Amino acid sequence: WNEISDDLGQRFEISFNTYKPFACGIVIHPSIDACVQLRKMHQLQAADIAKVTIRVHSLVLELTGKKTPATGLESKFSVYHSCAVGLLYGQAGEHEYTDEVVNRPEVTALRARVEAIVDDRIDEAAVDLTIRTTDGRDLHLVVEHAIGSLERPMSDAQLRAKFVG
């Protein structure tokens, strides 16, 4: 019973809410964040990418393991689709989760090159991403906490871009 009354009037759960930068399930956010970061760091284009390997917590595949979504709604539950649009477009907003985008040839082609592996060492808020480029390089990034998390909240500029454009 102490759990109910501990910190009563001092701790407010609402203060632990954050804004989601991406229009999909929260467990996918670290993967998108990593894809967007590597895309920007290395000016990646889809033609540069031979394979994408994400090492994730088991919950990621349990909740968002849909490999070939057919609709915008299904794509919101696909870590594969989310990685593909993050790499292709550098974002994963509402527009990237539409029926039209899900079926674009460049999206389906890149989505097919994404491999997700469950790794018990990875926290549900993290991802270990490796991109193998067509010229043989391995680009690697670990994201412990995605943008939009309590540990890495969105900046005012990012919030303006999300809501105002």
Regions found by a protein language model. Name each.
Residues 1-165:
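Terminal-appendage/accessory-domain detector
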